[in-house]
Amino acid sequence: MTATTAESGNLLPLVSGRSRPPRHLADLSRDERRAVATSLGLPAFRADQLARHYFTHHLRADDADLMTDLPASIRPALVEAMLPRLLTPATALDCDGGQTRKTVWRTVDGAKIESVLMRYPQRATVCVSSQAGCGMGCPFCATGQGGLTRNLSTAEIVEQVVDAARTMAARTTAEGGLPGGPGRLSNVVFMGMGEPLANYAALLAALHRLIDPAPDGLGLSARGLTVSTVGLVPAIRRLAGEGLPVTLAVSLHAPDDELRDELVPINTRWPVAEVLAAAWEYARVTGRRVSIEYALIDGVNDSPERADALAALLVGQLAHVNLIPLNPTGGSSWQASAPRGQRVFVERLRARGVAATVRDTRGREIAAACGQLAAEPPVRSRAGR
């Protein structure tokens, strides 16, 4: 089946035959949540109370007994109507001394998605999926090699973040927390499975749920949110006008159309010049620096000449290059650039006035690093919870 997405007007492949996930309060506006409460014969403010338990205290249906401001007699109906279980953890894998955790989730219709929580000394970041699979077909990405199953709902996206916030708030590892004690989730990056801008409506609603204060959302800082895209130009321009100062990350991976057509197939539709023009418009409108994502592939896109070509495109722009040594996947024979090649690439960019750093890779051994989601991890370090 091919569907036209309302968010960008583009024809993108979707797989038919999947049921829609059940209604969840994270899918609903405040007025819609209140309407559900009144349809149950309850005062509208009961919906606000339930939403506070979810967004502020990260409570789930299993925690209904903790919602003591709700009369016990109404909890079952209210929870059933607006807090269905959308994601079930199938497997959780830890590495980096327990500071990185990948969770494999099963949706109610059996689709598989993954999220990754990473704890750093000064922050905690969760990488979330926006689709089950991906239809962009990038040959070095495990998700792209597997194809697209379906878009995620707003609530399915938000649930990944709420689970991460719940994990960070846990007091001990026995309660499901990470080593180091309780903390606060500070950053969300839409760099998991899927192309976020191909699921624009759900993405936009999810961003509002993450930013808006309780009882409408988690109250995270918009500046701690990053949306990654392979370059869906109409959607980039549309996002620029939404009034949300989130960071835009463009998965560029090549400075020229000939190579990028091979690495990022959507480039045949929106070439490098158009993608970067939209990115610079985004930076101008939002005042936010654009992150240019560039996977360093040995002998493919890591030559000094391509570093110079990339610098020529970016010099003078509000941009930062995030260089990512390619992470291995089973479907690709390409390898990461050698450390010396990485250093040379960075040095040539910086010498031409372009800010650039090499990403601190997390989770490679459990297939949780960039480009590895949906790849088979070589070591299983933790059973499902």
Swiss-Prot record:
Catalytic reaction equation(s): adenosine(2503) in 23S rRNA + 2 reduced [2Fe-2S]-[ferredoxin] + 2 S-adenosyl-L-methionine = 2-methyladenosine(2503) in 23S rRNA + 5'-deoxyadenosine + L-methionine + 2 oxidized [2Fe-2S]-[ferredoxin] + S-adenosyl-L-homocysteine; adenosine(37) in tRNA + 2 reduced [2Fe-2S]-[ferredoxin] + 2 S-adenosyl-L-methionine = 2-methyladenosine(37) in tRNA + 5'-deoxyadenosine + L-methionine + 2 oxidized [2Fe-2S]-[ferredoxin] + S-adenosyl-L-homocysteine
Residues that coordinate or bind S-adenosyl-L-methionine: G194, E195, S228, S251, L252, H253, N327
Cysteine disulfide links: C127-C370
Sorted UniProt keywords: 4Fe-4S, Cytoplasm, Disulfide bond, Iron, Iron-sulfur, Metal-binding, Methyltransferase, rRNA processing, S-adenosyl-L-methionine, Transferase, tRNA processing
Any Pfam family: Radical_SAM
Binding site for [4Fe-4S] cluster: C134, C138, C141
Enzyme Commission no: 2.1.1.192
Residue positions of the active site: E114 (proton acceptor), C370 (s-methylcysteine intermediate)
Occurrences of domain Radical SAM core (ranges): 120-364
InterPro entries assigned to the protein according to its UniProt record, in alphabetical order: Aldolase_TIM, Methyltransferase_A, RNA_MTrfase_RlmN, rRNA_lsu_MTrfase_RlmN/Cfr, rSAM
Transmembrane segments: none
Co-factor binding details: Binds 1 [4Fe-4S] cluster. The cluster is coordinated with 3 cysteines and an exchangeable S-adenosyl-L-methionine.
Cofactor: [4Fe-4S] cluster
Gene Ontology biological-process annotations: rRNA base methylation; tRNA methylation
Similarity comment text for this entry: Belongs to the radical SAM superfamily. RlmN family.
Additional remark text: Reaction proceeds by a ping-pong mechanism involving intermediate methylation of a conserved cysteine residue.
Function: Specifically methylates position 2 of adenine 2503 in 23S rRNA and position 2 of adenine 37 in tRNAs.
Protein name: Probable dual-specificity RNA methyltransferase RlmN
Native organism: Parafrankia sp. (strain EAN1pec)
